[in-house]
């Protein structure tokens, strides 16, 4: 029996669909990264050495290996997409689930519970001329990247980083200061050592305490016993500040003006898997505004049409771009990327050397 025209057309469409599906599957397969178990195992062993990991629990190494494989899959899938502005990689957190990462290194939502003195010092005004790029590292105002360890003390590292910066700008001396003094001694209504805190309260403590010790005199140990070392705390304070102020909130232009003058403490949402495994480039991934991590902005710039903030983190050198992240700047949201413009603040200190002030005319 001869096939009807309709049957011929239907058969042709079915064959065409199969061919198209096979073609699309072939393309997808070509972009996938296939890794065998031996290769992944070797990568895992190398990662363990590089990150000085040693698991004691029975079966813990294998359990972590499974998590490592899941994170490696995420890394391969992310980096295989063309035109990404940033790359992810096997950071120091590659053996943690995202839930574990958030529980250990991030804390409850950070909220501005203590406002500073109202000021328009860095309020952006029409006509202000700001540098296209600023990097306080190049100006010698940023201490090398530190590591908060398994302690939720990001607030202390953020505040101390801003104080180290303004102290260098006003005195010419770059001194590494003590986060541990804040963790041990700044205990009050909000700040709670390894259980989180707010940068403005840290600035307040430094003021009332008459200054803050050096990291050498009061070294960091990532422990939270709630005991202030009175002997160390009573030493001569090395660095003081005059006060602290908030950058006008929800305004990236004002934040840019502030960062053009000094490093600034900010809070961001850092809970995504992409942030956990961030390696390099301009971070443009999805993130919200549930602020859970304190960092310090040490500059800004642009590359390939993408504006970014330069952020010094406190997760050591085996995360990000040697401890730094470039976070997308000038987005169509008043809160800024990951909420960066929601809670910025900075310490104040007099005697700005005119030769060092980048914007003496503003």
UniProtKB/Swiss-Prot annotation:
The enzyme's E.C. designation: 3.4.22.-
Active site annotation, chain numbering: 154, 293, 313
SUPFAM superfamilies hit by this protein: Cysteine proteinases (SSF54001)
UniProt keyword annotation of Thylakoid present: no
Molecular function in Gene Ontology: cysteine-type peptidase activity
Entry annotated with the keyword Oxidoreductase: no
Glycan-carrying positions: 36, 234
Keywords of this entry: Disulfide bond, Glycoprotein, Hydrolase, Protease, Signal, Thiol protease, Zymogen
A GO BP annotation: proteolysis
Cysteine disulfide partners in this protein: 151-194, 185-228, 287-338
A Pfam family assignment: Inhibitor_I29
Position of the signal peptide: 1-28
Pro-peptide region(s): 29-129
Enzyme class, broadest EC rank: hydrolase
Family the entry assigns: Belongs to the peptidase C1 family.
Function summary: Probable thiol protease.
Stated name of the protein: Probable cysteine protease RDL2
Recorded name of the encoding gene: RDL2
């Amino acid at each position: 029996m001869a096939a009807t025209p309709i049957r011929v057309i239907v058969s042709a469409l079915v064959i065409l669909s199969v061919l198209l599906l096979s073609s699309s599957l072939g393309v997808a397969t070509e972009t996938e990264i296939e890794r065998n178990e031996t290769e992944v195992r070797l990568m895992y062993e190398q990662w363990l050495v590089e990150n000085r990991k040693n698991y004691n629990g029975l079966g813990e190494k294998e359990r972590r290996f499974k998590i490592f494989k899941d994170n490696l899959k995420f890394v391969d899938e992310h980096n295989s997409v063309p035109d990404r502005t940033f790359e992810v990689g096997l950071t120091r957190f590659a053996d943690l689930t995202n839930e574990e990462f958030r529980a250990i290194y991030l804390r409850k939502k950070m909220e501005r519970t203590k406002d500073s003195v109202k000021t328009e010092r860095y309020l952006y005004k029409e006509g202000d001329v700001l540098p296209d790029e600023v990097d306080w590292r190049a100006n010698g105002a940023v201490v090398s990247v530190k590591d908060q360890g398994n302690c939720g003390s990001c607030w202390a590292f953020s505040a101390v980083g801003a104080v180290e910066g303004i102290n260098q700008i006003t005195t010419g001396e770059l001194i590494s200061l003590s986060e541990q003094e804040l963790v041990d001694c700044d205990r009050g209504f909000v700040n709670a050592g390894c259980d989180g805190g707010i940068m403005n309260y840290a600035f307040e403590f430094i003021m009332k305490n008459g200054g803050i010790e050096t990291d050498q005199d009061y070294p960091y140990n990532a422990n939270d016993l709630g005991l202030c070392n009175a002997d160390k705390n009573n030493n001569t304070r090395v660095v003081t500040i005059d006060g602290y102020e908030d950058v006008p909130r929800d305004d990236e232009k004002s934040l840019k003006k502030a960062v053009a003058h000094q490093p600034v403490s900010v809070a961001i949402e850092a809970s995504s898997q992409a942030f956990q495994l961030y390696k390099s480039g301009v971070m443009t991934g999805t993130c919200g505004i549930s602020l859970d991590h304190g960092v310090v902005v040490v500059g800004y710039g642009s590359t390939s049409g993408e504006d970014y903030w330069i952020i010094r983190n406190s997760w050591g050198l085996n995360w990000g771009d040697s401890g730094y992240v470039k976070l997308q700047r000038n987005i169509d949201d008043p809160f800024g990327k990951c909420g960066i413009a929601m809670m910025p603040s900075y310490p104040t200190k007099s005697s700005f050397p005119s030769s060092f002030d980048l914007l003496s005319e503003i």
